[in-house]
């Protein structure tokens, strides 16, 4: 590994960029890219009720094909800083590890790809094609003023991407474990029933909505939504909260509601899920009036089917680690869901065991290997 990758990772981690703060991270990255000939654009996106977010777009070259790297420089809060072995923004190197908030998720990967890209450009000055960066400060937050708007802006400028790598920490245990080739969708909903409040000693004067809610919940979770597909696990509806608006033991509540989340595969859309849930509820409602509402969904299921590009990435990983990575769609959502509407996308970064945790850290050796993997991908992509 050139010192550039580790130095850049430390410089990025040293910037306290807890969403929505940038902390100077984009300036650090932009200066490196500009110095190597990238055209850069800093963009601040706005939306009422949300914080303004800074974003960075950079591109070297103008021809096709274009390989774009996408990532986020924002990080989650550190919690109690004194619980950490080292200052979470000191970017300390100790015991062969780089310590700090964002080391795994995902400043280490941004640094590794940047170092790989700069070295590749220096060694292949006349390569045919383009390398681009989509970097946001709004991935750990509401994801409203980040990648989704950056992609729209790029399309309006006539920018075209052929393939994308997202530097999420995809490896559960060791580097080379896993490539993400898709993600499940995510849909939030609320099921509510209105009854009549009353004293528990006089139930005939009230209408308790809780037993009715329990019966309807059973209709939602009693039968699996599906059995999964070739690339996805079965879809899952998980009830995450129950409430009735009162903590008193002697009061029958006037209203009861259940909040739930569905992680769904490529057999479903938010619209077909809504129809399925309504059909299940109506089959057992027996005259019970209910309300079923959903939050707006910006997390659809997507898949990049295995092809030459996924083989290129997998081969580069196997060459450097000796492991053939699993092609997976497990885990939560990421900004890859937005990118999938523009080009095929895969995710591969560092090991994610400590992401979002106290004492987040990554192996310095893994940063070196990841840089080499990214370099191998670039060399295979632009022969």
Curated annotation (Swiss-Prot):
Highest taxon above the source species: Bacteria
One Pfam family from the record: Peptidase_M20
Membrane-spanning intervals of the chain: none
Keyword Amino-acid biosynthesis belongs to the record: yes
InterPro entries, A to Z: ArgE/DapE_CS, Bact_exopeptidase_dim_dom, DapE_proteobac, Peptidase_M20, Peptidase_M20_dimer, Peptidase_M20A
E.C. code: 3.5.1.18
Binding-site residues, Zn(2+) 2: 105, 140, 356
Active site residues per record: 74, 139 (proton acceptor)
Co-factor remark: Binds 2 Zn(2+) or Co(2+) ions per subunit.
Record-listed Zn(2+) 1 binding positions: 72, 105, 168
Record pathway: Amino-acid biosynthesis; L-lysine biosynthesis via DAP pathway; LL-2,6-diaminopimelate from (S)-tetrahydrodipicolinate (succinylase route): step 3/3
Disulfide linkage: none
CDD domains found in the cross-reference section: M20_DapE_proteobac (cd03891)
Keyword vocabulary terms for this entry: Amino-acid biosynthesis, Cobalt, Diaminopimelate biosynthesis, Hydrolase, Lysine biosynthesis, Metal-binding, Zinc
Swiss-Prot/TrEMBL cofactor(s): Zn(2+); Co(2+)
Alphabetized GO MF terms: acetylornithine deacetylase activity; cobalt ion binding; succinyl-diaminopimelate desuccinylase activity; zinc ion binding
SUPFAM superfamilies reported for this sequence: Bacterial exopeptidase dimerisation domain, Zn-dependent exopeptidases
Enzymatic reactions: N-succinyl-(2S,6S)-2,6-diaminopimelate + H2O = (2S,6S)-2,6-diaminopimelate + succinate
Entry similarity comment: Belongs to the peptidase M20A family. DapE subfamily.
Assembly mode: Homodimer.
HAMAP family in UniProt: DapE
Function of the protein: Catalyzes the hydrolysis of N-succinyl-L,L-diaminopimelic acid (SDAP), forming succinate and LL-2,6-diaminopimelate (DAP), an intermediate involved in the bacterial biosynthesis of lysine and meso-diaminopimelic acid, an essential component of bacterial cell walls.
Protein name: Succinyl-diaminopimelate desuccinylase
Organism in which the protein naturally occurs: Beijerinckia indica subsp. indica (strain ATCC 9039 / DSM 1715 / NCIMB 8712)
Gene name per UniProt: dapE
């Amino acid at each position: 590994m050139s010192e550039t990758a580790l130095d850049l990772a430390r410089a990025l981690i040293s910037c306290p960029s807890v969403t929505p703060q940038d902390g100077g991270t984009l300036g650090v990255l932009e200066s490196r890219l500009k110095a190597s000939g990238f055209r850069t654009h800093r963009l601040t996106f706005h939306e009422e009720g949300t914080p303004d977010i800074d974003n960075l777009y950079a591109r070297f070259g103008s021809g096709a094909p274009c390989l774009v790297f996408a990532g986020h420089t924002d990080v989650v809060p550190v919690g109690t800083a004194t619980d950490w072995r080292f200052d979470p923004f000191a970017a300390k190197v100790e015991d062969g590890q780089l310590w700090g908030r964002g080391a795994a998720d995902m400043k280490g990967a941004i640094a590794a790809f940047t170092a790989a890209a700069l070295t590749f450009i220096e060694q292949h000055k006349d390569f045919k094609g383009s390398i681009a960066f989509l970097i946001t400060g709004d991935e750990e937050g509401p994801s409203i003023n980040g990648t989704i708007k950056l992609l729209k802006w790029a399309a309006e400028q006539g920018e075209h991407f052929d393939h994308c790598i997202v530097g999420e920490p995809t490896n559960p245990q060791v580097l080379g474990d896993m490539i993400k080739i898709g993600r499940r969708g995510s849909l939030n909903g609320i099921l509510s029933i209105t009854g009549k409040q009353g004293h528990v000693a006089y139930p005939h004067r009230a209408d308790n909505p809780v037993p009715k809610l329990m019966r309807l919940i059973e209709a939602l979770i009693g039968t699996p939504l599906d059995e999964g597909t070739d690339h996805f696990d079965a879809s899952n509806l998980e009830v995450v909260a129950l409430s009735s608006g009162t903590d008193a033991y002697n009061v029958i509540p006037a209203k009861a509601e259940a909040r739930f989340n569905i992680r769904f595969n490529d057999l479903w859309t938010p619209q077909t899920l809504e129809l399925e849930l309504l059909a299940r509820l109506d089959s057992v409602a027996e005259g019970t009036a209910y309300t079923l509402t959903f939050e707006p969904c910006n997390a659809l299921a997507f898949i990049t089917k295995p092809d030459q590009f996924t083989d290129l990435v997998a081969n580069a990983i196997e060459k450097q680690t000796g492991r053939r990575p699993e092609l997976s769609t497990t885990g939560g959502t990421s900004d890859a869901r937005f990118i999938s509407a523009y080009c095929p996308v895969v995710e591969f970064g560092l090991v994610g065991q400590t992401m979002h945790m106290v004492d987040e850290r990554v192996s310095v050796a893994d940063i070196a290997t990841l840089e080499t993997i990214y370099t191998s991908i670039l060399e295979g992509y632009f022969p």
